[in-house]
A protein has these predicted regions:
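N-terminal glycine-rich anion-binding loops that anchor highly charged ligand groups
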Residues: 4
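Acidic active-site catalytic centers that drive phospho-/nucleotidyl reactions
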Residues: 7-9, 23, 75, 97
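Generic N-terminal amphipathic, Lys/Arg-enriched alpha-helix
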Residues: 7-17
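A non-catalytic alpha/beta surface segment that caps or lines the substrate-entry region
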Residues: 19-66, 86-91
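Active-site metal-coordination/substrate-binding segment of hydrolases
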Residues: 67-101
Length: 101
């Protein structure tokens, strides 16, 4: 079973410009990582009659109880004017023990 470094994984995830409704591949990326460590994953698409389709990742590990559920999100807000950034968005950077996400 593979192991993952938390900082490396966080940097990989941050590189995806996953601005709703475009997930930029982050769902498939995370599903692959979770599948590699034993999860069964499904990417589900939800659409309200007045909205655009939005993808969600459903991942399950095992079938026994008790069950544990974690809910999070993989989308980000639009970065706005790129010229206003000192560190480019979607470019995770660590400088002198400070992180810029």
């Amino acid at each position: 079973m593979p192991t993952y470094n938390e900082i490396t994984l966080a940097k990989e995830l941050i590189r995806f410009p996953s601005i709703t409704p475009v997930d930029a591949g982050v769902m498939k990326f995370l599903a692959k990582k979770l599948t590699d460590i034993g999860f069964k994953c499904k990417i589900l698409e939800f659409k309200d009659k007045n909205s655009i389709p939005v993808k969600n990742l459903y991942a399950r590990l095992g079938n026994s109880q008790p069950n544990f559920m974690f809910a999070g999100h993989l989308d980000v807000v639009p970065p706005g004017n790129i010229k206003d950034w000192t560190i480019k968005p979607f470019s995770p950077t660590i400088k002198k023990n400070s992180s810029y996400w």
